């Protein structure tokens, strides 16, 4: 079972004539992950992350800012009992999560992971935030 689903709410996302998405390398994974988790627009999420970044004196996509944002929005930081890939985590977790990988964030929601490509499914997670 493939538990990946394409997701890119960025207003500048482009598609080929056949409807398939073009490659995406914008560095906005933090914004996209939280967009999906909170059912918000890319712009609203980016503005909120920037506001938190002003408080933390850090950039919107940096770990200190994303952690402060997640906690401010009611998420709870959790530890993994063992090493898990994003795909394995998604298969066993129903609910809403923002997963922290090495230099990447991805949203897992109701047993699927949402990103601009399925390449991160085999990556190991470091920690995650759960929306409670």
Language model regions located:
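Active-site nucleophile-adjacent alpha helix/oxyanion-hole segment immediately C-terminal to the catalytic cysteine
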Residues: 1-59, 64-74
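Conserved active-site-adjacent core of cysteine acyl-enzyme catalytic domains
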Residues: 53-103, 109-111, 115-118
């Amino acid at each position: 079972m493939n538990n990946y689903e394409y997701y890119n709410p960025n207003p500048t996302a482009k598609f080929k004539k056949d409807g398939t998405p073009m490659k995406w390398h914008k560095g906005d994974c933090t914004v996209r992950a939280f967009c999906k988790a909170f059912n918000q627009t890319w712009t609203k999420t980016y503005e909120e992350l920037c506001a938190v970044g002003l408080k933390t004196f850090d950039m919107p996509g940096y770990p200190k800012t994303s952690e402060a944002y997640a906690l401010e929005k009611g998420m709870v930081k959790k530890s993994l009992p063992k090493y898990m890939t994003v795909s394995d985590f998604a298969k066993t977790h129903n609910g809403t999560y923002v997963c922290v990988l090495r230099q990447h964030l991805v949203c897992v929601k109701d047993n699927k992971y949402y990103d601009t490509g399925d390449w991160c499914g085999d990556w190991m997670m470091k920690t995650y935030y759960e929306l409670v």
